[in-house]
Amino acid sequence: MNTKSIIAALGLAAMTLSGSAVAQTRDYGINVINDTGTTIEYFYFSACRDQNWGRDRLGRQEVIRDRQSRFFDMYDGVRSCCRDMRAKLVSGASRQRMNVDVCREHQWVVR
């Protein structure tokens, strides 16, 4: 292998490593603020390309009461920043936000 090939290979390796380091340092967090006048009973999020919501992220014991907030780390192994979110209220109504770039937007006020 000649010197040019070695330098090119090292450059490619450095770019690959720096790209994965950037993905790991992205902030996938979002603060969900309940401004609905009622309680959020279930909260779901998924990568934008997913066809289903997955599991309730609040679990069995937790809710988000009116005027309360909850932080969620939305990194779930998918490096894309695009997430869909759904909040289901105790009344059965739901609110959705689709195609949110959670690496840039870090708050959702649910109304």
List each model region and its residues.
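Short acidic/proline- and small/hydrophobic-mixed sequence motifs that coincide with surface turns
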Residues: 38-42
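Extracellular beta-sheet/turn segments enriched in Thr/Pro/Gly and aliphatic residues
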Residues: 93-111
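Asparagine-centered strand-capping/turn motif at beta-strand->loop junctions
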Residues: 30-37
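Bacterial N-terminal signal peptides
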Residues: 9-16
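A short, solvent-exposed beta-strand micro-motif common in secreted/extracellular proteins
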Residues: 80-89
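Bacterial N-terminal signal peptides that target proteins for export
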Residues: 1-8
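Intrinsically disordered, low-complexity Pro/Gly/Ser/Thr-rich segments with frequent PxxP/GP/PP motifs
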Residues: 53-77
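Sec/Tat signal peptide C-region and signal peptidase I cleavage site
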Residues: 19-23
